[in-house]
UniProtKB/Swiss-Prot annotation:
Alphabetic keyword roster: Ribonucleoprotein, Ribosomal protein, RNA-binding, rRNA-binding
Organism expressing this protein natively: Chlamydia muridarum (strain MoPn / Nigg)
Function: Binds 16S rRNA, required for the assembly of 30S particles and may also be responsible for determining the conformation of the 16S rRNA at the A site.
Keyword flag GTP-binding: no
Family per record: Belongs to the universal ribosomal protein uS14 family.
Source taxonomy: Bacteria, Pseudomonadati, Chlamydiota, Chlamydiia, Chlamydiales
Protein's gene: rpsN
Subunit structure: Part of the 30S ribosomal subunit. Contacts proteins S3 and S10.
Name listed for the protein in its UniProt record: Small ribosomal subunit protein uS14
Family matches, as Pfam families: Ribosomal_S14
PANTHER family attached to this UniProt entry: 30S RIBOSOMAL PROTEIN S14 (PTHR19836), SMALL RIBOSOMAL SUBUNIT PROTEIN US14M (PTHR19836:SF19)
MF terms (GO), sorted A to Z: rRNA binding; structural constituent of ribosome
Gene Ontology terms: cellular component: cytoplasm; small ribosomal subunit
Any one GO biological process: translation
Entry annotated with the keyword Calcium: no
InterPro entries cross-referenced by the UniProt entry: Ribosomal_uS14, Ribosomal_uS14_bac/plastid, Ribosomal_uS14_CS
Length: 101
């Protein structure tokens, strides 16, 4: 089980990313655009640098919905490999059966 503070921090980051996604995208577009002046691009880069670090989507880390475990995350099921194995063996995940050949 992950620390509650780590899970809460991740939730906070997700909210920040969602709230600032549009503004960040516009600034990135301006910073990369060759059609605007160099001065304008520089201002856009500075504005991006002044934004909070946690507004960047690259700071997000997927976590298990049940335990908060950050590693061994299965995207399709949004849980960790350990929880997946337990739930699959108990038959709690529809359509998942143990392979045999």
């Amino acid at each position: 089980m992950a620390k509650k503070s780590a899970v809460a921090r991740e939730v906070k980051r997700r909210k920040l990313v969602e709230a600032n996604f549009q503004k960040r995208a516009e600034l990135r577009k301006l910073a990369k655009s060759l059609s605007v002046s160099e001065e304008e691009r520089e201002r856009a880069r500075e504005a991006l640098n002044k934004m909070k670090r946690d507004t960047s989507p690259s700071r997000l880390h997927n976590r298990c919905l049940l335990t908060g475990r950050p590693r061994g995350y299965l995207r399709k099921f949004a849980i960790s490999r350990i929880c997946f194995r337990q739930m699959a063996s108990m038959g709690d995940i529809p359509g998942v059966i143990k392979a045999s050949w």
